[in-house]
Amino acid sequence: MSTESALSYAALILADAEVEITSEKLLALVTKANVEVEGIWADLFAKALEGKDLKEFFFNFSAAPAAAAAGGAAGGGAAAEEAAEEEKEEEAKEESDDDMGFGLFD
């Protein structure tokens, strides 16, 4: 098992038990699982997760894509119209370039 995976699982276990995530607790869990991890990695994970609620992160993460999909479906028609207008403007600009006499084989 990789260091990152072991520490991630240990952090999730601590968060599920509603225990503060510290480097000492991360190392204790990882060593009980017979995974060798350097102390600096546990310190980095503990500092990165300090003050963050992992449960809230996962609950908000699962709800966000559903809300974005619902909002995108409602406004899809307007976006298609804007794209069509932009294409028409680009075609008009390309045609006007031909009239300037800058052709390659003129």
Swiss-Prot record:
Recorded GO MF terms: protein kinase activator activity; ribonucleoprotein complex binding; structural constituent of ribosome
Biased composition (Acidic residues): 82-100
Xref: Gene3D superfamilies: 1.10.10.1410
Subcellular location as annotated: Cytoplasm
Database matches in InterPro entries: P1/P2_N_sf, Ribosomal_P1/P2
PTM notes: Phosphorylated.
Gene Ontology cellular component terms for the protein in this record: cytosolic large ribosomal subunit; ribosome
Superkingdom of origin: Eukaryota
Chief location category: cytoplasm
Assigned keywords, A-Z: Cytoplasm, Ribonucleoprotein, Ribosomal protein
Annotated stretches, region: Disordered: 74-106
Biological process per Gene Ontology, one example term: translational elongation
Pfam families per UniProt: Ribosomal_60s
PANTHER family from the UniProt entry: 60S ACIDIC RIBOSOMAL PROTEIN P1, LARGE RIBOSOMAL SUBUNIT PROTEIN P1
Quaternary structure note: Component of the large ribosomal subunit (LSU). Mature ribosomes consist of a small (40S) and a large (60S) subunit. The 40S subunit contains about 32 different proteins and 1 molecule of RNA (18S). The 60S subunit contains 45 different proteins and 3 molecules of RNA (25S, 5.8S and 5S). The 5 acidic ribosomal P-proteins form the stalk structure of the 60S subunit. They are organized as a pentameric complex in which uL10/P0 interacts with 2 heterodimers, P1A-P2B and P1B-P2A.
Described purpose of this protein according to its UniProt entry: Component of the ribosome, a large ribonucleoprotein complex responsible for the synthesis of proteins in the cell. The small ribosomal subunit (SSU) binds messenger RNAs (mRNAs) and translates the encoded message by selecting cognate aminoacyl-transfer RNA (tRNA) molecules. The large subunit (LSU) contains the ribosomal catalytic site termed the peptidyl transferase center (PTC), which catalyzes the formation of peptide bonds, thereby polymerizing the amino acids delivered by tRNAs into a polypeptide chain.
Protein family membership: Belongs to the eukaryotic ribosomal protein P1/P2 family.
Protein name, entry field: Large ribosomal subunit protein P1A
